[in-house]
């Protein structure tokens, strides 16, 4: 295992992507500092939730992937890295409960 304990990373931006990067790096043993111009992190994510932000869809994975139409071949590898079920597990690991709406969308 590489020596990550002496490594540190500064992430500029406390939005969803910055926070996800911080979590991945921190779990790998890297010291992470997150900087944002706003006084609190994840504000856009929280505001999107007020409007009914869904995080994924509950349908069968193969069908889910077809929703990306012509872009599916380019996105498949990325989708396979974090399929909907695994995304829900990650959200639950953050202590956030989810529910499936009548449309099949998964909401926090």
What residues fall within each predicted segment?
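Flexible, glycine-rich phosphate/dinucleotide-binding loops
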Residues: 18, 41, 62
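P-loop NTPase switch module centered on the Walker A-proximal segment
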Residues: 105-108
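Glycine-rich FAD pyrophosphate-binding loop
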Residues: 10, 26-50
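Glycine-rich active-site loop/strand segments that organize a redox cofactor
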Residues: 52-103
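Beta1/beta-strand and adjacent pyrophosphate-binding region of the FAD-binding site
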Residues: 2-17, 33
């Amino acid at each position: 295992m590489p020596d990550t304990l002496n490594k540190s990373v500064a992430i500029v931006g406390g939005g969803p992507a910055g926070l996800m990067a911080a979590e991945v790096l921190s779990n790998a043993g890297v010291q992470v500092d997150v900087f944002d111009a706003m006084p609190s992190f994840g504000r856009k994510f929280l505001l999107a939730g007020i409007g009914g932000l869904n995080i994924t869809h509950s349908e069968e994975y193969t069908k889910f992937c077809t929703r990306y139409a012509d872009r599916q071949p380019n996105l498949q590898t990325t989708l396979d890295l974090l399929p909907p079920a695994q995304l829900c597990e990650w959200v639950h690991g953050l202590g956030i409960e989810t529910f499936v709406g009548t449309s099949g969308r998964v909401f926090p």
